[in-house]
């Protein structure tokens, strides 16, 4: 075996993939820590997913990140699925074992809580209800994480009521579903507020939920990070809230996979953030 074939490969699979910041992030960490390795973005069509996953270990890949639209599909293709990935119903991190088995995990929830703990140090999730807007895959990861850290109640609103009801049936009595027209009315006394929808993202409709009932003691975070300062965060900051943008979640969710693939737990700090924003 040559030296070249021993260099670990990782990557991110999705479609489209050109927008992903993951290659810049992992490339920065590899350079920062002086590690041998490569991180490669791959545009993979749904029809090719099974064949690509089967081929990657033979090509020297030790694992990969997974993004839209494959996060749910890879659950059924993995040999071993962590409990949290099974609960969420999606995986964003794959590890290719030396035994040939594919291990699937979901680090979105831990990335979410790590981002809040780093950038809102006074955040106390047990101190009051949480409001979550959206009921997609990101919302599932966030709700699982909020339950794990002890949030007493989760008020969920989504533009499709049926999706929110399905999510409640999976996560249990702590989740209370509200119609989307009530999205602003469920803010009273909430201590954590999370937008998991694409509203406010570049190229998407603007976020227009009224925030009059927002608790100024709440921590407000938006998973959207393009733009970094969304309308929600600007208005919440004006109301006196501590606000946290969505870029930190992307950075923190990436760290566990990088450690598994390349053997070093990377720091998520201002230098990391600046390197990703510069791309």
Curated annotation (Swiss-Prot):
Enzyme class label = oxidoreductase
In alphabetical order, the GO MF annotations are: NADP binding; shikimate 3-dehydrogenase (NADP+) activity
The UniProt record lists the keyword Oxidoreductase? yes
Would you say which domain of life the source belongs to?
A: Bacteria
Record flagged with keyword Amino-acid biosynthesis:
yes
Q: Which SUPFAM superfamilies match?
A: Aminoacid dehydrogenase-like, N-terminal domain, NAD(P)-binding Rossmann-fold domains
Q: Which reaction equations make up its catalytic activity?
A: shikimate + NADP(+) = 3-dehydroshikimate + NADPH + H(+)
Any idea which UniProt keywords this protein has? Amino-acid biosynthesis, Aromatic amino acid biosynthesis, NADP, Oxidoreductase
Q: Name one GO cellular component term.
A: cytosol
The residues that the entry says bind NADP(+) are 83, 134-138, 223, 246
Task: Spell out the catalytic residues.
Answer: 71 (proton acceptor)
Q: What is its EC number?
A: 1.1.1.25
Pathway as given in its UniProt record: Metabolic intermediate biosynthesis; chorismate biosynthesis; chorismate from D-erythrose 4-phosphate and phosphoenolpyruvate: step 4/7
GO BP annotations, alphabetical order: amino acid biosynthetic process; aromatic amino acid family biosynthetic process; chorismate biosynthetic process; shikimate metabolic process
Q: Where does shikimate bind?
A: 20-22, 67, 92, 108, 225
Biological function:
Involved in the biosynthesis of the chorismate, which leads to the biosynthesis of aromatic amino acids. Catalyzes the reversible NADPH linked reduction of 3-dehydroshikimate (DHSA) to yield shikimate (SA).
Q: How does it assemble?
A: Homodimer.
- Belongs to which family? Belongs to the shikimate dehydrogenase family.
Q: What is this protein called?
A: Shikimate dehydrogenase (NADP(+))
Native organism = Cereibacter sphaeroides (strain ATCC 17023 / DSM 158 / JCM 6121 / CCUG 31486 / LMG 2827 / NBRC 12203 / NCIMB 8253 / ATH 2.4.1.) (Rhodobacter sphaeroides)
């Amino acid at each position: 075996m040559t030296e070249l074939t021993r260099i670990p490969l990782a990557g991110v699979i999705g479609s489209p993939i050109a927008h992903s910041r993951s290659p810049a992030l992992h490339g920065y960490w590899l350079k920062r820590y002086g590690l041998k390795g490569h991180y490669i973005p791959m545009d993979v069509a749904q029809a090719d997913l099974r064949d690509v996953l089967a081929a990657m270990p033979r090509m020297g890949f030790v694992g990969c990140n997974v993004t839209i639209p494959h996060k749910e599909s890879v659950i059924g293709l993995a040999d071993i699925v962590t409990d949290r990935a099974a609960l969420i119903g999606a995986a964003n991190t794959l590890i290719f074992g030396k035994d040939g088995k594919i291990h699937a995990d979901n680090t979105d929830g831990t990335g979410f809580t790590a981002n809040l703990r780093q950038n809102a140090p006074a955040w106390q999730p047990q101190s009051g209800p949480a409001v979550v807007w959206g009921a997609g895959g990101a919302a599932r990861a966030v709700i699982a994480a909020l339950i794990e850290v002890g949030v007493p109640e989760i008020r969920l609103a989504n533009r499709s009521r049926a999706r929110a009801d399905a999510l409640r049936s999976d996560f249990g009595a702590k989740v209370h579903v509200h119609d989307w027209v009530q999205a602003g009315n469920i803010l009273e006394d909430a201590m954590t507020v999370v937008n998991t929808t694409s509203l406010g993202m570049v190229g998407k409709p603007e976020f227009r939920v009224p925030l009059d009932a927002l608790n100024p003691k709440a921590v407000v975070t938006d998973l959207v990070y393009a733009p970094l300062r969304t309308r929600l965060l600007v208005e919440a900051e004006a109301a006196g809230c501590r606000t946290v943008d969505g870029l930190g979640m992307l950075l923190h969710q990436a760290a566990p996979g990088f450690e598994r693939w390349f053997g070093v737990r990377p720091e998520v700090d201002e230098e990391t953030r600046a390197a990703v924003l510069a791309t």
